[in-house]
Amino acid sequence: MPGSKIVYMGNVDRDEDGLNLATATDEQIRHIRGNEISMIFQEPMSSLNPVITVGDQIMENILTHEEVSKEEAKQRAVELLAEVGISRPEKVVDNYPFQLSGGMCQRVMIAMALSCHPKLLIADEPTTALDVTIQAQILSLMNKLKNETGTSIMLITHDLGVVAQVADNVNVMYAGKVVETAPVEELFSNPKHPYTVGLMNSMPSLAEEGKRLNTIEGSVPNPLYLPKGCYFADRCPYVTDRCKEGQPTDTKIKSRHHVWCFKVEEEMKQEG
């Protein structure tokens, strides 16, 4: 079986000492994982161990990275559950995941991820399995934690509504490649890449009730057999021969707005 870490290309460097996480040893990664970098997974019910109490699962991360007693770690677990909005945390800390709702399990995952005050929190579709009411509460909680603790959040989502509510800066990816990056307000008001425009046009609108939703024709290319040209070419309404022959390069729209698209590149040349 392959190892748990496979790096195909590129570096992931830590600012303070330049440590490349892509080539770091297992011991170095163990110190960073759950401590400096934490993650909230998409399915809380399947990410938590069903035969271990939620308190013990939070305590495990604290005891791994900090020199504290079990009593201190349990008190921290209770405090963390309270911080993420769980009522009666002193009782819930001894509950098993199956005794909690999906929303409460997601809050437990957030408490666990924040237990060692990480610098970076990776949230992979953190609200997908939740109803809209709980989703709004979780997003509000993430915004609160971001503002109060200074933790950076890398949010992975397909929901543009979630992006608008939480993100400061957005990278739009297609077939594993960034095609547009911009501050969130700029991206929503001035999308440039045809894929980004297609995503925006596919959003349902309350002002146009009953209107059929727009879709992007075609399907994502097989990641094992990616085309040599633009990955979006086969689905793009503006495709040209050039798009199928090579990869587009970075086109600067504004200081923090960049697009990888031949069409946009030509438009900027004409304007400029």
Identify the meaning behind each predicted range.
Residues 17-19, 23-29, 56-72, 82-87, ...:
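ABC-type ATPase nucleotide-binding domains, specifically the catalytic core motifs of the NBD
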Residues 115-119:
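A short, proline-enriched helix->beta-strand linker immediately N-terminal to the Walker B motif
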Residues 11, 16, 72-91, 200:
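Conserved ABC ATPase "signature" region
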Residues 7, 14-38, 64, 186-191, ...:
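ABC ATPase NBD coupling module
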Residues 18, 87-90, 181-272:
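Short catalytic/signature loops enriched in Gly
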Residues 95-100, 104:
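Conserved ABC ATPase signature
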Residues 122-126, 130-211:
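P-loop NTP-binding/switch modules centered on Walker-like glycine-rich loops
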